[in-house]
A protein has these predicted regions:
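PP2C/PPM-type serine/threonine phosphatase catalytic domain
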Residues: 1-295
């Protein structure tokens, strides 16, 4: 078993709004990992006195603890309970009904000698490496499947000069349109973990036999830029890079690509530099039936 993780803020002057962690129970039976990507708050506030880093630390910590200690619960149930616990921790001081109350994307995975469970909510990514080499991405694609009128707004933003008043106004209009799709109770749009535990039922979940998974890699979208935005390689190449050079090297290469295109001319994006987090778990050979893993 090998765990490697890196988390780095997009701007060193501001705290990282991601959360990344992993746990290996002392029993030696499997493990779990969690990566959250906190949604950057709007300038006009969120109704919360704590902030996004506090929220992701509370939610991520609760989810990891539940996934590790409550193995009888599904990951969806663990996420639902973690959201409830986090909401209870600040419902007396904050307006959790605010549309932009702190929220985050979620990746979680849990494994033992028999199976690997996964959960993905919104645009963070989980990669499953199989023993014979192929890599399967687990994606929640709903944020990328925007309606045509919103895609048109996005194209309009990208066509306007960087830094101009026209671009700022167009971007504000685009952001409002996207936000109107977030956590819609009617089942349309896309979902992030905020204060409503019911959102957990919208997560992409599944189970894979342990014998079919040799490694896992969880990525916030700041780290998955290497493949999704900068097109430096496919998912298999990304995981191979991490296996060979580590998660720190992946983030460093993303930073190089960001610096090479500081104004988003070649690769239009909302942030020149984004928080980037990655957790890699190399599971190692599966223990023979009837034998406990040594972790």
């Amino acid at each position: 078993m090998r765990i490697d993780m890196t988390g780095e803020p997009g701007d060193p002057r501001h705290p990282n709004e991601d959360y990344a962690s992993a746990a290996l129970p002392s029993s030696g039976e499997g493990g779990a990992l969690v990566v959250l990507d906190g949604v950057t708050p709007p300038r006009d506030g969120t109704g919360c006195v704590h902030g996004v880093p506090w929220f992701t630390a509370r939610l991520g910590g609760a989810l990891l603890e539940l996934a590790t200690a409550q193995r009888d619960l599904t990951l969806g149930s663990c996420l639902s309970e973690a959201i409830s616990r986090t909401a209870a921790a600040h419902c007396s001081t904050c307006d959790l009904s605010h549309s932009r109350t702190p929220q985050a994307t979620v990746v979680a995975a849990r494994w033992d000698e028999e199976r690997v469970e996964h959960l993905v909510l919104s645009d963070s990514v989980l990669l499953l490496e199989h023993p014979d080499g192929p890599v399967t991405p687990v994606l929640d694609s709903r944020l990328g499947e925007l309606p045509p009128h919103i895609r048109a707004l996005r194209s309009r933003v990208r066509a306007l000069p960087e830094g101009g008043a026209g671009r700022r106004a167009a971007r504000a209009e685009y952001v409002r349109a996207v936000e109107a799709l977030r956590n819609n109770p009617d089942g349309t749009g896309f979902y992030t973990a905020a204060a409503d535990p019911a959102v957990a039922r919208h997560a992409v979940t599944g189970t894979t036999p342990r014998s079919e998974v040799s490694a896992l890699l969880a990525l916030s979208d700041g780290a998955s830029r290497w493949s999704e935005m900068f097109r430096l390689g496919d998912w298999a190449a990304l995981l191979a890079l991490v296996r060979k050079e580590g998660t720190g090297s992946l983030v460093a290469r993303v930073r190089e690509a960001e610096r090479a295109d500081p104004h988003g001319t070649a690769h239009p994006r909302g942030k020149a530099h984004d928080d980037a987090s990655a957790v890699f778990a190399e599971l190692g050979p599966q223990a023979p039936a009837g034998e406990a893993s040594d972790g």
